[in-house]
Amino acid sequence: MATFSEEQEALVNSSWEAFSQNIPQLSIIFYTSILEKAPEAKAMFSFLKDSDGVPKDNLDLEAHCEKVFELTRNSALQLRAKGKVEVERIALKFLGYVHAQRRVLDPHFLVLKEALLKTLKEAMGDKWSEEVSNAWGIAYDELAGVIKKGMS
């Protein structure tokens, strides 16, 4: 169980605001970063499978990116409020099933975390800090742990 401070929650919320201001551009940075580190991941995303590179103006891509960041932010809020991340049973089964079907492995979770942090750093510019990185990293790690449990 991770402890999450009020300051960490505030950092996640303020950086979420920076991210949500420019989802179309930041989603391209996010998926480009994923594919640079793990080109095989392209086949895991239906909206990337049949494209060369990362398509611009792709609503499915943008929605998925926003969902990843939103789930991670919600994990931070839960960590602060409850001391743990909880996902509804139906949602957990779905997340676990989808990730298992796509053959997501532990290294893929790490690649996604690195892409998430890189994207947030881009969104925040000079307001980025190690503290912001740590707060999002904790929230993401807890969420990934819950999804991995749902995969088994």
Swiss-Prot record:
Positions annotated to bind O2: H64
SUPFAM superfamilies, A to Z: Globin-like (SSF46458)
Modification type Phosphoserine: residues: S46
Ranges of residues in domain Globin: 3-152
InterPro entries recorded: Globin (IPR000971), Globin-like_sf (IPR009050), Globin/Proto (IPR012292), Leghaemoglobin-like (IPR001032)
Residues with the Nitrated tyrosine modification: Y31, Y140
Pfam families (alphabetical): Globin
Tissue: Mainly expressed in leaves and, at low levels, in roots of non-nodulated plants. However, accumulates also in nodules and roots, and, to a lower extent, in leaves, stems, flowers and fruits, in nodulated plants.
Binding site for heme b: S46, K67, H99, R102
Modification(s) after translation: Nitrated in effective nodules and particularly in hypoxic conditions; this mechanism may play a protective role in the symbiosis by buffering toxic peroxynitrite NO(2)(-). Nitration level decrease during nodule senescence.
Keyword Transferase listed: no
UniProt GO BP: response to abscisic acid; response to cytokinin; response to jasmonic acid; response to polyamine macromolecule
Gene Ontology MF terms: heme binding; metal ion binding; oxygen binding; oxygen carrier activity
Knocked-out gene: effects: Smaller plants (shoots and roots), reduced number of leaves and nodules. Delayed growth associated with altered leaves metabolome linked to amino-acids processing, hormonal balance (increased accumulation of salicylic acid, but reduced methyl jasmonic acid levels), as well as fermentative and respiratory pathways.
Expression triggers: Induced by polyamines (PA), abscisic acid (ABA) and gibberellic acid (GA), but repressed by ethylene and cytokinins (CK, an equimolar mixture of kinetin and 6-benzyl-aminopurine) in nodules. Induced by abscisic acid (ABA) in roots.
Keywords: Heme, Iron, Metal-binding, Nitration, Nitrogen fixation, Oxygen transport, Phosphoprotein, Transport
Sequence similarity: Belongs to the plant globin family.
Function summary: Atypical leghemoglobin that reversibly binds oxygen O(2) through a pentacoordinated heme iron. In nodules, facilitates the diffusion of oxygen to the bacteroids while preventing the bacterial nitrogenase from being inactivated by buffering dioxygen, nitric oxide and carbon monoxide. This role is essential for symbiotic nitrogen fixation (SNF). Seems not restricted to symbiotic nitrogen fixation and root nodules formation, but also contributes to general plant development and metabolism.
PANTHER family in the cross-refs: LEGHEMOGLOBIN-RELATED, NON-SYMBIOTIC HEMOGLOBIN 2
Quaternary organization: Monomer.
Name the record gives this protein: Atypical leghemoglobin 2-1
Originating organism: Lotus japonicus (Lotus corniculatus var. japonicus)
